[in-house]
């Protein structure tokens, strides 16, 4: 699969929300159903307008996306149908080309993501007992140190 990175388009907002939903459903089974719904509502409210970087396949179909704020990657979500095909790595490499001191946070219970980040060169630099909304889902703070 050939992956390209481009900016998101407003008209593909629903498609990106669908990727978020499939990705979260595949990796975040630790979330309560109520909180999962709350997060989806929040994502639906801001994702179509967010300045995302989108990974697309040869047909220009989105297969993943990330949100980068300065040196911090706020979000990275990959369609589970293409997990293991290098989409996440390509997005991280793109982020590093713009933000060489890249940091991110990941849910501690999301073992797949924790393993991915360590594999591509991140190390744990801290831990929070709660997520960004103050809910009891611990976050690991990560910084890129090189693969």
From Swiss-Prot:
Record carries keyword Transferase: yes
GO molecular function: protein-lysine-acetyltransferase activity
Lineage: superkingdom: Bacteria
Catalysed reactions listed for this entry: L-lysyl-[protein] + acetyl-CoA = N(6)-acetyl-L-lysyl-[protein] + CoA + H(+)
UniProtKB keywords: Acyltransferase, Transferase
EC number(s) on file: 2.3.1.-
InterPro entries xref list: Acyl_CoA_acyltransferase, GNAT_dom
Class in the EC hierarchy, top level: transferase
Keyword Ligase recorded: no
N-acetyltransferase domain ranges (all copies): 3-144
Purpose: N-epsilon-lysine acetyltransferase that catalyzes acetylation of a large number of proteins. Binds acetyl-CoA.
Protein family: Belongs to the acetyltransferase family.
NCBIfam families, alphabetized: PRK10514.1 (NF007807)
Protein name: Peptidyl-lysine N-acetyltransferase YjaB
Species the sequence originates in: Escherichia coli (strain K12)
């Amino acid at each position: 699969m050939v992956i390209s990175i481009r900016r998101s388009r407003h008209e593909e907002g629903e498609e990106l929300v669908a990727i978020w939903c499939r990705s979260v459903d595949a990796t975040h089974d630790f979330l309560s159903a109520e909180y999962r719904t709350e997060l989806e509502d929040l994502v639906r409210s801001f994702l179509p307008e967010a300045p995302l970087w989108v990974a697309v396949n040869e047909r220009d179909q989105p297969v993943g996306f990330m949100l980068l704020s300065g040196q911090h990657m706020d979000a990275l979500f990959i369609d589970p149908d293409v997990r293991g095909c290098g989409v996440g790595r390509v997005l991280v490499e793109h982020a590093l080309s713009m933000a060489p001191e890249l940091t991110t946070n990941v849910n501690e219970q999301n073992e797949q993501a924790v393993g991915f980040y360590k594999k591509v060169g991140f190390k744990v630099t801290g831990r929070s007992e709660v997520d960004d909304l103050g809910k009891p889902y611990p976050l690991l703070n990560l910084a890129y140190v090189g693969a």
